[in-house]
């Protein structure tokens, strides 16, 4: 990340190992007659602890996905920059019986496994969140048309429906999904409402088909 203020350039970067974070401040201290900078002062400081705290604040403690707090922040950021995105909401089907039958520990392990699969459904430029007990959200960078949205929903559904083997127990769940696109379907608030409505419409259809 690069920022500038009062002729000071701030660069945040991490080592290739991914576990050492630094902030580099570059300050011009001498200029030539042509106005070009001839001498710089570079100051580097460790910001690893700050990055770690920010990561913890934005991460769901159970699944390792981003949390609802960061979800709202990401959508706000997209809207402030007027960058298009596609939002997918998904709610697990048949999750409650897993908790009732095998206990909450098994339910937690299932949520972790679902989160792991969802990571494979998105690109590096996208985001995956846990926003409720068994509710998740995916934010895809860029707008997608209806055909692509339905393809993505089918991919999510097939990924989640594959049986899970947890502690020797085979568990099968499904996913009810809804989607909306910013700015095609309105502002970020309207997009969230529409995606939520479509998700619950999908859940009603899934219940009716049982």
State the predicted function of each range.
Residues 19, 24-40, 48, 187:
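Short loop/turn elements at sensory-signaling interfaces that couple input to output
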Residues 34-63:
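Sensory coupling linkers of modular signal transduction proteins
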Residues 54-73, 90-104, 112:
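Conserved nucleotide-binding and Mg2+-coordinating catalytic segments in signaling enzymes
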Residues 54-55, 68-84, 115-123:
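Short regulatory alpha-helical coupling segments
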Residues 95, 114, 128, 136, ...:
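Hydrophobic framework residues that shape the active-site pocket
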Residues 127-130, 171:
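A short pre-motif secondary-structure segment
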Residues 150-157, 161, 165-167, 173, ...:
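Catalytic-core segments of nucleotide cyclases and related cyclic-nucleotide turnover enzymes
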């Amino acid at each position: 990340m690069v920022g500038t203020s009062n002729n000071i350039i701030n660069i945040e970067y991490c080592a290739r190992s991914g576990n050492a974070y630094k902030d580099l401040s570059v300050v011009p201290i001498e200029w030539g007659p042509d106005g070009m900078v001839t001498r710089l002062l570079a100051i580097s400081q460790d910001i690893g602890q700050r990055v770690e705290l920010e990561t913890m604040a934005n991460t769901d403690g159970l699944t390792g996905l981003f949390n609802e707090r960061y979800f709202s922040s990401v959508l706000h950021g997209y809207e402030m920059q007027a960058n298009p995105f596609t939002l997918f909401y998904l709610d697990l089907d048949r999750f409650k019986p897993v908790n009732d039958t095998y206990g909450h520990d098994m339910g937690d392990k299932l949520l972790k496994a679902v989160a792991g699969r969802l990571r494979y459904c998105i690109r590096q430029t996208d985001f995956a969140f846990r926003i409720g007990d068994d509710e998740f959200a995916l934010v895809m960078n860029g707008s997608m048309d209806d055909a692509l949205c339905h393809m993505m929903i089918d991919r999510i559904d097939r990924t989640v429906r594959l049986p899970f083997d947890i502690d020797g127990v085979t568990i099968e769940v499904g996913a009810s999904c809804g989607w909306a696109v910013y700015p095609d379907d309105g502002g970020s608030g309207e997009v969230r409402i529409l995606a939520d409505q479509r998700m619950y419409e999908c859940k009603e259809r899934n219940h009716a088909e049982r």
